Amino acid sequence: MPDNRRSQTITQGAQRTPNRAMLRAVGFGDGDFDKPIVGVANGFSTITPCNMGLDTLAKCAEHALKTAGAMPQMFGTITVSDGISMGTEGMKYSLVSREVIADSIETCVQAESMDGVIAIGGCDKNMPGAMIALARLNVPSIFVYGGTIKPGHYQGRDLTIVSAFEAVGQHTAHKIDDHELLEVERHACPGAGSCGGMYTANTMSSAIEAMGMSLPYSSTMAAEDEEKRISAIRSAEVLVDAVKKQILPRSLITRKSIENAVSVVMAVGGSTNAVLHLLAIAHAAEVEFSIDDFEAIRARVPVLCDLKPSGRYVATDLHKAGGIPQVMKMLLVHDLLHGDCLTISGQTIAEVLKDIPEQPRADQDVIQPWDNPVYEQGHLAILKGNLSSEGAVAKISGIKNPSITGPARVFDSEETCMAAILERKIQPGDVVVIRYEGPQGGPGMREMLSPTSALIGEGLGDSVGLITDGRFSGGTYGMVVGHVAPEAFAGGTIALVQEGDSITIDAHRRLLQLNVPEAELERRRAAWHPPAPRYTRGVLAKYAKLVSTASRGAVTD
């Protein structure tokens, strides 16, 4: 079969004279119509520092594709900035953007009969959005991550964007003054790149590398470093070879490779959002994978990396310490990684890792030795109980108290909760409930970084629990439980919680329980009525009608 097996439908034969005429206008010459057409899906944007360097990478890839004998076609896809929209109505569009990104890439590639795809992304939803599209399309594809931001510095300490969120709570609690708050703001984000800790963007780029859909080491490179541009060039070269060999995404995105991705997410201390996104990617690839599979993997994989938000280091430190390949090699040696999984280069995982040392270097402490991990088991626990019969996700790293039973403080939106926190109305021992923020009810399943950061800034991070049918940022830590399913809007038990009810969060027992007699719950359930939709027109209304439960990845198809 020719390398242009898909695009020949628009480039070959007398009937396609008009098609070729238009292609000539965008740069095709007589000798180009037999070449494979490779789409470059570019998430470039000046909306966010995460994506402002992507155009440079896209141009590098474009040039490399031409040199390798392919015809690149550049097209854009959207991004939203989770960090800038955080704590506002705009955050409702964040998870929605994952679907828009996936749909736009799928639409463009299918409409133009492209033979391959390079997807370039930076901010949180770019990665899963692209991967969902590539899994649906199943044409030769590779992902290029825009790279991580370097840490900011102030008064001898490293800063990330989460430092700024936590500074708000510190300021409210009069722990810092106006001047220091402004200085944190000025220094937290020094340039281009995705948020620097093992937050959602770096978590998902690491997961994609673990699945073999991006090049080794590419997930932890700094956005502004030359090696990131070299990686984009190399990715284009590898993709052209994959087009020739017909290495397809669904040969790479398998149950085994998703298990590898989950193992790596656990080992690096990654974001709770990985649960939602990997479920959605599995769904797009038609791979059977459930929320319970995360718990099974968590129980056997240790946390090896001491990374923010609960640890000390950022992604660039992990890169210097050996990157994701070093973490993967340690997992492989201890039979916690499937070495026979294929990668986009045509090599297996075991072949890619062949020359990586079995132990991390002794001159660094970002990656801990196997016999002295940060935590002996994974940090993303699936909690069940009468509050979450379908499951909920807790990040149990960095918490001093693995269980809490306390009175419910109930809020039907993030805004009302945030106001109560800033007015110092939340007390130690409380369990905060933020509901009607789920995929359907929000709609859009907003991230609750502002409330959790404010609690931490006020010194309540270890003494207050928080549960929500919304999500958490990758920057969140503490006694927090998200993705509670069924959600309140769908009549889940979280909708029945009343102010002052006793709630138990127990990470060790993996329990999320409303301590109210079943008869009383049934009485409340009979009296409950779903609220009217918050939106009746536009993209949020469409999304609310289509989206699934969080326990299935909040998918829309």
From Swiss-Prot:
The keyword Metal-binding applies. Pathway: Amino-acid biosynthesis; L-isoleucine biosynthesis; L-isoleucine from 2-oxobutanoate: step 3/4; Amino-acid biosynthesis; L-valine biosynthesis; L-valine from pyruvate: step 3/4. HAMAP family: IlvD. This is Dihydroxy-acid dehydratase. The lineage of its organism: Bacteria, Pseudomonadati, Pseudomonadota, Betaproteobacteria, Nitrosomonadales. Keywords: 2Fe-2S, Amino-acid biosynthesis, Branched-chain amino acid biosynthesis, Iron, Iron-sulfur, Lyase, Magnesium, Metal-binding. It comes from Nitrosomonas europaea (strain ATCC 19718 / CIP 103999 / KCTC 2705 / NBRC 14298). It is an enzyme of class 4 (lyase). Mg(2+) binds at residues 82, 124-125, 447. Its cofactor is [2Fe-2S] cluster; Mg(2+).
